[in-house]
Amino acid sequence: MSSSYGNNGDKNNHEKFGFNLLRKKPQQPSNRSERRADDSSSSEDEAGPSSNYVSSSQLNLPSFRPSGGSTDELNRANRTNVGSSDARYSPRTASNTESGNRRQQMIEDDAIATIRDNSGAARCFDDDDEEEEEHQEQKDSGENPADISPRTSGVTKKLQFKSHPSIIPEDTATQDGGEYYEEKDAEKEDQDDSVSTQSSESKMDHFRHLFRRRSTARPHQETNDGRNSAESHSKGGMRNLNGADDEVEDGGFLSKFLSLTGGGLTPAVNNTDPSGENDHERNAGQNNLEDPIPMSDIAATAQQIVQAHSMMAGKSAPGTQHGASGSASSEHPNGEHNLGTEAGVTSPFEPVSPFNQSTDGETMVSSHQDDAFYVPATNHYDDIDDPDDLEPLGIEGSYIAPVDRVRGGVLGSLLKLYQNQDDQYTKSQLSLNDSSIEQTPEPVDQAGKSDQKTGKKIYNPFHKHSKSQTNVSGANKSGSSMNLPNFKATRPKAAAKNLVKAKNFKKKAAAEARITVHIADLLQRQRFILRLCKALMLYGAPTHRLEEYMVMTSRVLEIDGQFLYVPGCMIISFGDMTTRTSEVQLVRCNQGLNLWKLHGVHSVYKQVVHDIMSVEDANMEIDRILTGKNLYPPWVSVLLYAFCSSMVTPFAFGGDWINMAVAFGIGLCVGSLQFIVSQKSNLYSNVFEVTASIVVSFCGRALGSIPNSNICFGATVQGSLALILPGYIILCGSLELQSRNLVAGAVRMFYAIIYSLFLGFGITLGAALFGWIYHDATNETSCSKNISPWFRFIFVPCFSIGLGLINQARWTQLPVMTLISCCGYVVTYFSGKHFANSTEFTSAMAAFVIGILGNLYSRIWKGFAVSAMLPAIFVQVPSGVASQSSLLAGVQSANAIVNNSTTTVVQDDLSGSMSFGVTMIQVSIGISVGLFASTLFIYPFGKKRTGLFTL
């Protein structure tokens, strides 16, 4: 094809787009580039043909030369093209040709400077497939590539700007090979044709060609900007070469105006946004795009996401043990999972378990095993399970072997719950707010897609679904698995997305509910242990085995607990192996005695241990017991106290019928102080024993001083104080010392001794007060008249019944209590006849019989041994004290105080008080030895079955 076609086409196109505006002043030297070209024409004439080409050193440019080519070769090609154009257009003279060549070189120099200042692009490359396709079409059609440019100037998608060969990177030319030289030759021919056909307006024509090529090449430059930006920076692209000085020298007004207007005065040609050319945010992070993608990092990240979110879609089933754990499949052992499918992960609907068993740090989303809430039990350093330590009271059912695992603590469960929520916001910047994985829509980077055609599909930011979105429903539907970001464009269906979102929401809620239920269940179990401990302490359980009861209870409930008992306080520590922490609780209460409520607490404990009653129901039952009222109101207890005082006086202290009546009246006074006044005033309760002993001693000596009244001072005083004697306190202390609970036993025993001294001091003070008032007060401590011993068969059962009722026993418990008490007293009576003045031995024999009967009742009839044995023990204490008459030893000291014989007062008072304390200790030691011996006799080999409480 001739070049005239191209020129005509150019002319038409110029007139079409308004280029004739530039023809009005074609030769004005106002343009800075034209003036510089005219000034340099003389120097170029002297240089000769060898200086037709401007080297890169003159332009302060690096030597960008294609491999295999040089400047001389390019100059020879230029001269060849010029010669061919002269031959084609013979009317032109040689001078015109020379001037045309010089003008052509000046135009090219000015164009290069303008491009260097404004464009910064070396060469716009399309993808290999598109170039091959374009050149194949050109070869098939037989057209010259130089002829295509003017003909397709209106089509902006196929036009590219091919800059001077000297500014083309070397590696680019090496890759393109022959295609590059074809484009170069076509460009040269096009320029030579334009020079040969123009005279005075040739410069403006070349500028029009240049502007058209720049404007049409800009869309392709924007398309491949991400891929070529790193190359232009690393190879010294033209944008990096211009500085402040170069911009002032080379840039003209027209070039700056054109650069600001986006590449020309024809708005129809430019269809790109000029503001995005220097968008630093879009160009940021493009330095290492030519490096290969590290697939190992992607695999590691995928594995982490698999482990964190694998079981989110797994099926869970509620546990059967204590309602706290679920179940799941562990078919795949560790190391069996891989990044298998097209997306690189397994399916979310397949139960993936990175570990065979749940670990401490596992969340409930990724673990549904039955042992998800369990941790290994802590090896506590106690001697409860020491095989060398023989526990003589190891009765049936009270021993529970240590468990291998326990439930995790509250803190560990809360951390699992929070970790469960945090995992949805951490891994790989994925959003799990709506239980679906979506990636932020961003323009697709075309740099890494050399094997794909960019085509005509341009990113549309207003499209609803971008190609970079990855939705979990599409991945699940295609079976590509674990909801990782997929590089393939998928368009999920709304129905499937909503379905998966609902399923994931249900599974997330189920996981949180399971953790919440576990925490609630754990708190219920810990609360049950605390309430059980308080109830046992408050209602009079055997204190020497209280720690063991708590340990066995915690083992049954799978709670990691440690217990330390001191009188009046239980220190409880709940451990958490998950976080290596512990929670310490203190249970403090005054020890009391309530046989019926103690029986109810024991019943609840037994049902919980044998899995008959749930922990929630047990807590409600214990709360009902703790908040429930006593069986008998205080005024009934006062009458019962007086009744018991009158019943104990004949058979224990040798009183007659009159002394029984007097003891009843004084007992009413003492009972009122204990059950009414002491319950309303905490301050008075601290001095109750001393004040009660003072009142009893004062009233008893006053009544006994009445002439011819036959009132025995000693019988009435001891009978009235029999129910407040520290027999039970000393008994518990001796049992604790016998079971090697040294801390509690020593403290309780010392308190019992001081308590006895309080009573002795009160008796002495009351007798001395009445002696100061009445100088003829009686000094006799023994009774002259006694009731027949056969009446004791009536008094002892009545006293036992009264003791049971005062201690809030139900009437159904009274027959067993009365029987055991009568049997114990028979042994005490006949052994006292044979072993005179041997309190310890007599008490030991009686306690042995009482222990045998109580343990047989517990083993055969599955009864409650403690409630059956305690009234019988209380019967033994007054009998032992009465055998020594130590309680009235202070009366002699009172007489000495009244008679002002102070020389022996201190010694007598000390001996009297200490003798009473020693007598109480002797009785308690004999009782404790007898109880241990009876337990060993009933359970010779430590057989343990169902009996839970014993003395």
Curated annotation (Swiss-Prot):
What is this protein's record name? Pheromone-regulated membrane protein 10
Q: Where is the composition biased (Basic and acidic residues)?
A: 219-234
**InterPro entries of this UniProt entry?**
ThrE-like_N, ThrE/Ser_Exporter, ThrE_2
Q: Where is the composition biased (Polar residues)?
A: 1-10, 68-84, 92-104, 318-332, 354-366, 468-484
The subcellular localization recorded is: Membrane
UniProt family annotation? Belongs to the ThrE exporter (TC 2.A.79) family.
Q: Where is the composition biased (Acidic residues)?
A: 126-135
Annotated transmembrane regions: 635-655, 657-677, 687-707, 711-731, 753-773, 786-806, 811-831, 841-861, 863-883, 918-938
What top-level branch of life does the organism fall under?
Eukaryota
Molecular function GO terms recorded: transmembrane transporter activity
- Which of UniProt's keywords are assigned here? Membrane, Transmembrane, Transmembrane helix
Task: Give the bilayer topology.
Answer: Multi-pass membrane protein
User: Main localization of the protein?
Assistant: membrane
Region (Disordered) residue spans: 1-293, 313-366, 433-487
An annotated GO cellular component of this protein is: membrane
